[in-house]
Amino acid sequence: NTATCSMHRLADFLGRSSNNFGAILSPTNVGS
């Protein structure tokens, strides 16, 4: 669970830091 939480936080941080990275994780956001 701890590792999963860390991954979620890391993904969220990277997503906010780089829109391109977040777009790759969530292609739906690109459409909208």
From Swiss-Prot:
GO biological process: one example: amylin receptor signaling pathway
Top-level taxonomic group: Eukaryota
SMART domains referenced in this protein's UniProt entry, alphabetically: CALCITONIN
The entry's keywords: Amyloid, Hormone, Secreted
GO molecular function: hormone activity; receptor ligand activity
Transmembrane spans: none
Pfam families: Calc_CGRP_IAPP (PF00214)
Protein localization: Secreted
Function: Amylin/IAPP is a glucoregulatory peptide hormone that plays an important role in the regulation of energy homeostasis. Selectively inhibits insulin-stimulated glucose utilization and glycogen deposition in muscle, while not affecting adipocyte glucose metabolism. IAPP function is mediated by the CALCR-RAMPs (AMYRs) receptor complexes. Amylin can also bind CALCR receptor in the absence of RAMPs, although it is more selective for AMYRs.
Family of the protein in this entry: Belongs to the calcitonin family.
Free-text note on domains in this protein's UniProt record: The mature protein is largely unstructured in the absence of a cognate ligand.
Subunit note: Can form homodimers. Interacts with IDE and INS. Interaction with INS inhibits homodimerization and fibril formation.
Protein name, entry field: Islet amyloid polypeptide
Species this chain originates from: Saguinus oedipus
